[in-house]
Amino acid sequence: MTVQINYKSNIPKKTATNLIVFVDEKYNTKSLKNHVSNQEYSYINDLLKTCDVKKNLLVFEISSKKKIILVSAKKDVQESDIENLGAELYTSINNGKKANFSVNTDTIISKIDNFLGHFLHGLKLKSYIFNKYKTKKVTSHITINVIGKKNKSTTYNKLKFKALEEGTFYTRDLVSEPGNVLHPDEYAKRLNSLKKNGLKINIYDDKKLKKLGMNALLGVGQGSIRGSYLVTIEWNGANNNSKPLAFVGKGVCFDTGGYSLKPAKFMEDMTYDMAGSAVVVGLMKSLAMRKAKINAVGVVGLVENMVSGNAQRPGDIVKSFSGKTIEVLNTD
C-alpha cells in the first residue's frame, strides 16, 4: 500500500472528488457549508440526526463516486490523538483499491501546531504493510490532495515527519523479517549500510569481542553457526563535545532459550526478541535523516541463542566485560 501526499496551490471552494473535512466534537457543520453543495449540505445534516456522533469520524456516501468524511476533533486534542485520527481515517478509506481524496485544511479548528502534519503522519504510519514474501501481493494506492489556506507545511516539518516515518518503517521491517533471513550476520551487514545516512558505524565481531572480554554476550551466541556482534551507531549533530544521549537495544535474532529450552508453543514469536535493537536502529536513522542537532549513540548486541554441541550449558561460568564472573543457571 502506498500513500501519496500532494499539496495543492489552487483552492477550489467546492470539489467533486472524495472530501475530508474537520468538525468539532459536536459535529457542528458550519465549517462544511462553504465546501459542499447545498444539496450535499442538507443531505449530511439530515443523516446526522440519526448518526452516532460519539464516533471520531463519519462517512457519507454522496454517490458511487464521491464520499464526504467528517473528522471530529476536540479543540484541546493531543498530538497522539491527532495521529490516531489519521490512522482511523486510513482504516476507513483503505479498500485495497486506488482512491483519491482531498483534505480541506480550512476546516481545522484545533490550536495544535501543525495539526495537519500529525494527522497525515498517523495516516501514513497506519499504511505500513510487510508483504515482502507474499506470493500474491495486493497493491493499492491512496492519493491525498491537501487543499486550503492552511495547507502550507514548512520544509523542516515535512522533513521531520518523513524522518519519523522512515525510521519507524525501518524498525518494523527489521522486526518483521523471519529468523532465517535476519540472523546476526545479515543484521550487522544491514546496519553497516546506514553509513550512507551519515551515521558512524562500528561493528565488533567475535574476534574483537573476545579480545575485549565480552564473554557474557559471546556465551549467548556460542551455540549458533552465525557470528555474534556488538554494533555502535553514532550521530554527531550538535557540532560540539556535549555528552551524547545513549540508547541500548537487545538484539537476540532468535531465542530458543538454549538448553533451557522454551516451550514449542509460540516459539516462532522469538524472532521478535530483537525488537529492542530495531527500535534503537530506527531511532538513530530518524535522527540522522532529520539532521537532529544532538549527539547520540545507539548500542545493540546481536546474537542468536541456539541449541548445539557448542552451546552454553546451565551451570557454565563466564567472565563479563566488567571483570565479574557469572554463573549461568538458566540459558534462557
Model-derived regions: residue spans:
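Glycine/charged-rich beta-loop-alpha catalytic/anionic-binding loops adjacent to active sites
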Residues: 66-73, 169-173, 243-247, 253, ...
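Short amphipathic alpha-helical segment within the helicase RecA-like ATPase core
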Residues: 1-251
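Short acidic, glycine/serine/threonine-rich loops at helix termini
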Residues: 112-116, 186, 212-216, 257-265, ...
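Gly/Ser/Thr-rich helix-start
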Residues: 220-224, 250-252, 256-259, 277, ...
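Alpha-helical metal-binding/catalytic segments enriched in His/Glu/Asp
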Residues: 191, 245-247, 261-304
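A glycine- and small-aliphatic-rich helix-loop capping segment at beta-alpha/alpha-beta transitions
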Residues: 116-122, 221-224, 262-271, 313-320
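A glycine- and small/hydrophobic-rich beta-loop-beta segment
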Residues: 291-332
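Active-site pocket-shaping loop/turn-to-helix segments
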Residues: 77-82, 270, 274, 329-332
